[in-house]
Amino acid sequence: IRRQRQMCIRDRLYVEHINYVSQAPSVQYRGIFINDEGWGITPWAGRTFDKELGDIGPKTYAKVCELILRMKGNMLAPAMHPSSGAFNKYPENKLVADSYGIIMSTSHCEPLLFNNVTEWDKKIMGEWNYMTNKEGINKMLDQRVLENAPYENIYTIAMRGIHDAGLVGVPKDKEVNLVQEVIADQRGILKKHIDSPIDSIPQIFVPYKEVLDIYERGLRLPEDIMLVWPDDNFGYIKRLNNKEERSRRGGAGVYYHISYLGEPHDYLWLNTTPPALMFEEMRKAYDTGAKRYWLLNVGDIKPGELGMKTFLDMAWDIDKFDFDNINNHQVDFLVSIFGERYREDIEDVMNSYYHLGFQHKPCLLYTSPSPRD
């Protein structure tokens, strides 16, 4: 029962002045990627905050931006599946992000903030094929940068197929040269619309899936572009900086999953990535120079709340964590909610949960049609 409290009116308010200087965060850009949103946040948003849109819209993104700030993050890669409207479909979305001081990024397959899943109309725009429709593709990318340049963004330099597919219509022996051309063209678009030196405009290159092979076959990446290493979709980072890459001016980062939709199998309903595994991988990445950009694929947000908190707390202060205390992090948070008297019970539940989930992810146990069907 909520107690009614009598309002007391005062004519003066005194606030104690305390000098406080915040520490510098361990990682410069720290944020989340909303992904595979069709089963959770999209229908929820359409029935609650953004009823008039029936979609994820500015009212929902305001709550997401507030959440990111409360967790000491500063960056968002928005939802981009066909089940939701593209972030830039609703002009108010970027105004909301800007009002919260949130830096907008995008996934590995969205060049220059363009979501080709729902914003590319094949009937009007033609094939998403850079070999045959370069002019049409760059026309859309040019328009997107023109519209979004006034805001703070991190631009993905990329060319893949539609959504999470590989390059279309490109012979393997021409892939490196084509991506090299793409990089030059997209940087040209940035130079055209942003009144800053190109090496001061935040850009990322994510060698995800087949792109890692293209990168390792001799792709020449400009020194100022951040090199963002992906994991294998199951929590193990596939590649770390070598000696030469550690000295790159653009620095490096990590794209990490605690939720995944794709081959060989999805895991969406439960976050079973152990904190110790996440710490081991992110600490290795940090120690080898991946400390400029950390992006967490958090799926629908709700199932991954604890993992998201651990990830962003590490991004804020990685040195607070070690192998002796990492398993206490989520326990301490839950104890702060439910009370110290439940600490042993919470420890037992969390240890058993991650032990069982690490042995075999529950989402991988079924052989019936996947959630996508």
Predicted regions and their residues:
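Single conserved hydrophobic/aromatic residue that forms the stacking wall/gate
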Residues: 1-5, 9, 366-373
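Feature activates predominantly on carbohydrate-active enzymes
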Residues: 2-6, 10-131, 149, 205-207, ...
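Gly/Pro-rich turn-and-neighbor structural signature
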Residues: 11-15, 88, 98, 128-249
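Short conserved micro-motifs at the rims of enzyme active sites and ligand-binding pockets
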Residues: 43-45, 167-170, 217, 238-240, ...
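Hydrophobic alpha-helical scaffolding
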Residues: 54, 83, 127-131, 172-176, ...
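Generic, well-ordered alpha-helical scaffold segments in large soluble proteins
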Residues: 64-67, 71, 93-96, 100-103, ...
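Substrate-binding cleft of secreted/luminal carbohydrate-active enzymes
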Residues: 276-346
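Catalytic domains of carbohydrate-active enzymes that cleave complex glycans
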Residues: 329-368, 372
